Amino acid sequence: MNVAPALRRIVIAVTVLLLAPPAGAQSHLESRNRWARLCEIRRDKFDRVLPEAMRENGIDMWIVPMREGDYDPLWNLLGRGYVGSIGYFVFTDRGGDRIERVAIDITDHNRAACGAYDIVPGTGDLAAFVRARNPKKIGINTSDEMGMADGLSHTLHRHLVTTLGPELSAKMVSADKLISDFSSRRVASELVAFGDATEIGRQIAERALSNEVITPGVTTLADVAWWIQEQQLQRGLGSSFEVPSVYITGPDGIEATSNDRIIQRGDIIMMDFGVGYLNMWTDQKRMAYVLKTGETRLPASIQRAFDQAVKVREVIRKTARAGKTAKAMMDEVTAAISAAGFTQMQGFNQVRNDASTEFIIGCHSVGDWGHGIGPSMAWFNPGRLNFEIRPTNLFSIELFAYTPLPEWGGRKLRIPLEDDAVVTSRGVEWLSPINHRVQLIR
């Protein structure tokens, strides 16, 4: 009997069984898991946040047009999809406890399964759709202050005016405050996702500033930046600010950033970067010192400078809370820091020639972008100082503290601290372990 053919068939059958995906394997696909989490976030945002954001701003219809190759900055937040010539996301307050949400001429084969949008047949005619709902005010994405809320191009604006006609287009108003509120007021599923993002970012940052990556006298700043980007690529993450800022600080300030400067013993290294995960974008900093030959611990002067910065951060943590405008809270925070014995800086990097520790804060909105569009206690976001801080707003708690170093002839070392948090009625609450130390590279 010739057993070879039978044996061959058995081998083939076993191989097929071994290579076949197990039953239910699709439920473990990372792409599907991320999609499911984003759907949950979108449903929660549309159900919980969008009604109050539209009603508080007096807008009963919000139209977000886009076309292929010209996607609005809110494309990810609203659910993406394929757009041919022109498509629209349209949100209408028709009363009750929910907002009608419709995608017109934006294709997504998973939209029904996601469940965030209403499936309204025959919605290809935008003008007829809008006339049937007869809104009082139509919000559009234009803004002088916030680029993320300014996605409507001149051509698409002209198209809207022509398509809707003079009577309806006269009702168009800027939706920038609506967009800010919708983006920055968080639901629980977002807070979980953002906590995951900050923890991922923390782990990458702390590994980057260690001997795992850095060999003194060999590794360049660019090597560290590329290592970070490789980690992001391998883990399917975005980058909040493209190339991470990995820089050396000296008596005259920043000496080199993410370039071919070789890291040497005695260097003080700072890093500023962010990761993108599940449409959540972080903004985080870490710091390291490269021990000189014979050193076993951080020099006392640098430790004191770091400790001073930590004290400033602790005042922010204890003082900042929801319930006031960002300007009122910023004034309260800076007064509390000054009362704790620190000197408020007159302007960013405008250092006094004295023995004081100076500070400046830039606690800004974060989340849908590395620099978000919610209320901000930051000198570089003046248009958002009048926005009220609401519970669940995400903030990057950013500060700079400048302390004299004796070995620098009294010139000041700038210590930047930045970790991401949620601000509640109780105060600042961290979402992952924050920076409590200067890392040592041996």
Describe each model-derived feature in a short phrase.
Residues 20-22:
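N-terminal signal peptide c-region/cleavage motif recognized by signal peptidases
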Residues 1-11:
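Bacterial N-terminal signal peptides that target proteins for export
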Residues 2-3, 15, 28, 307:
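A general, composition-driven signal for non-globular sequence regions
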Residues 10-18:
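Sec-dependent N-terminal signal peptides
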